[in-house]
UniProtKB/Swiss-Prot annotation:
Function, as annotated: Catalyzes the NADPH-dependent reduction of N-acetyl-5-glutamyl phosphate to yield N-acetyl-L-glutamate 5-semialdehyde.
CDD domains named among the record's database cross-references: AGPR_2_C (cd23935), AGPR_2_N (cd17896)
GO BP term, example: L-arginine biosynthetic process
Name of the protein: N-acetyl-gamma-glutamyl-phosphate reductase
Reaction it catalyzes: N-acetyl-L-glutamate 5-semialdehyde + phosphate + NADP(+) = N-acetyl-L-glutamyl 5-phosphate + NADPH + H(+)
Organism: Rhizobium meliloti (strain 1021)
């Protein structure tokens, strides 16, 4: 029998992208709810309990409600794309490349929390340096990022694309999260293995899909002997053999004059760069990804495939 997959929230931005990625797959049976019935709790509960894997593309509270609907059904496994369970100890964090053992944790899990888009890039850069002993305890990490506006869901898409919208946003680029309490900070801290919460400054650009995440570092405040080359080597070693995450060679990075945030739009890949001057005082770590790809829907499908391979 084919595994049954139900996307709860399939008509939203992330859910639609997951459907696109599953189109044409003959190895799955997709359960679906009509858009007009998407708030029909009884119908949702029935579909959730009929699935082998339920992928939740819902706001946090609705995701918690969906989890409660299948609490007594040990057969149903869940991938939650909301923020609700990303730092919960009994949920596997769905960043498969985070550790060598993470794919198996995802395969074995009943509950998988899909990472946030910004944390995917930040953790990809920070965690290997913590594990290699390069980034010391207590280092004051800063994360700066820009995302495509689809990361804000249907509401922001309408605000950015419809100039007749009463809340139209005409700015080509804007900062938000100005109180420094963005909901992605806790997972950056936990899964980045940080002792202190990072200072996180997110922003949105006037492009639909794409993302750049930056982590600038002072070399003199890192472990003794840390250089541009040792940092790059730590990332290369960590992601050796990975097909989705690419660490760009230093000589290639050195030739770049700019990075286009939309380069990987429509892709589920992620590129990591280390920039700096040989013998210089600073390095800038950069992750490039699609906020709806490896940053959301692509990761959800990757996690689903891992769970089905158990």
């Amino acid at each position: 029998m084919k595994p049954k997959i139900f996307i709860d929230g399939e008509h939203g931005t992330t859910g639609l992208q997951i459907r696109v990625r599953m189109a044409g797959r003959t190895d799955l049976e997709l359960l679906s709810i009509p858009e007009a019935e998407r708030r029909n709790a009884a119908m949702r509960e029935d579909l959730l309990n009929s699935a082998d894997i339920a992928i939740l593309c819902l706001p946090d509270d609705a995701s918690r409600e969906a989890v409660a609907m299948v609490a007594g059904n040990n057969r149903v496994r869940i991938i939650d794309t909301s923020t609700a369970h990303r730092v919960a100890p009994d949920w596997a964090y769905g960043f498969a490349e985070m550790d060598k053992a993470q794919p198996q944790r995802i395969r074995d899990a009943r509950h998988v929390a899909n990472p946030g888009c910004y944390p995917t890039g930040a953790i990809a850069l920070i965690r290997p340096l913590r594990q290699a002993g390069i980034l010391p305890d207590g280092y004051p990490v800063t994360v700066n990022a820009v995302s495509g506006y689809t990361g804000g869901g249907k509401q922001m898409i309408a605000q950015m694309e419809d100039d007749q919208n009463p809340d139209h946003i005409g700015a080509p680029h804007f900062l938000y999260g100005l109180t420094l309490k963005h909901k992605h900070v806790p997972e950056m801290k936990m899964h980045g293995l940080l002792e202190r919460a990072p200072v996180f400054s997110p922003s949105v650009g006037k492009f639909a899909q794409g993302m750049i995440v930056q982590v600038p570092l002072y070399l003199e405040d890192l472990a003794a002997g840390a250089t541009l080359e040792t940092i790059h080597r730590a990332l290369v070693d960590h992601y050796a053999g990975q097909s989705i995450v690419e660490v760009v060679p230093l000589d290639e990075s050195a030739k770049l004059a700019r990075i286009d945030a939309t380069e990987l739009a429509g892709s589920d890949a992620m590129k990591l760069f280390v920039f700096g001057t040989k013998g210089g005082a600073h390095v800038n770590l950069v992750a490039l990804l699609d906020n709806l790809g490896k940053g959301a829907s692509g990761a959800a499908v990757q996690n689903m495939d891992l769970m089905l391979s158990a």
